[in-house]
Amino acid sequence: MEQLISFFDRSKGKWISQRTTYKLSNKQMNSLQSSIIIKPDQSSSNSQLIASLRWGEISRQIIKNLNNQDFVNGNFKFHLRFTNQFNTKQVVTLCSITDKSLITFKTRYGSTTVDETYWFATDNLRLSTSIIKQCNFCVAVSFCSEIKI
């Protein structure tokens, strides 16, 4: 769990982001640049809350759930509660972390699965990939680079 908190601590700050997404169905590519400010969410008084961060209107929170934790071959897995302003319902995400520089999220929304991997190349360069599948068929992929300023 310390590795996850360390990853979130390293993510705090202002970032310039460049994301490129490729949709396989129509072979269309788009790129988006944005600025992200990641800061801790101190508005929660939940005693089960381990860590919480906000990316603008999006927040990710790690809630203690000792029944859903697994430690296998140095890979720590647990469930993450994910909420945002558009959907008040919490989504449970399987989160895996192997060291303080690499974290993966696997989220299911009905027949759609999103696999995300984030890692630090250096302290001020964070990279990520996302694979979106519908009915186990890949429909889109994306790559993102973020530079801390």
From Swiss-Prot:
One of the record's GO molecular function terms? lyase activity
InterPro entries to which the protein is assigned, alphabetical: Calycin (IPR012674), CpcS/CpeS (IPR018536)
The UniProt record lists the keyword Metal-binding: no
- What this protein is called in its record is Chromophore lyase CpcS/CpeS homolog
What the entry lists under CDD domains is as follows: CpcS (cd16339)
Subcellular localization(s) per the UniProt record: Plastid, Chloroplast
Its Enzyme Commission number? 4.-.-.-
Q: What does this protein do?
A: Might function to covalently attach a chromophore to Cys residue(s) of phycobiliproteins.
Cellular component (GO) terms are: chloroplast
Question: What keywords appear on the UniProt entry?
Answer: Chloroplast, Lyase, Plastid
Q: Does the keyword Ribosomal protein apply?
A: no
- Of which family is this protein a member? Belongs to the CpcS/CpeS biliprotein lyase family.
Q: Which residues form the signal peptide?
A: none
Q: What is the lineage of its organism?
A: Eukaryota, Rhodophyta, Bangiophyceae, Bangiales, Bangiaceae
HAMAP family given in the database record: Chrphore_lyase_CpxS
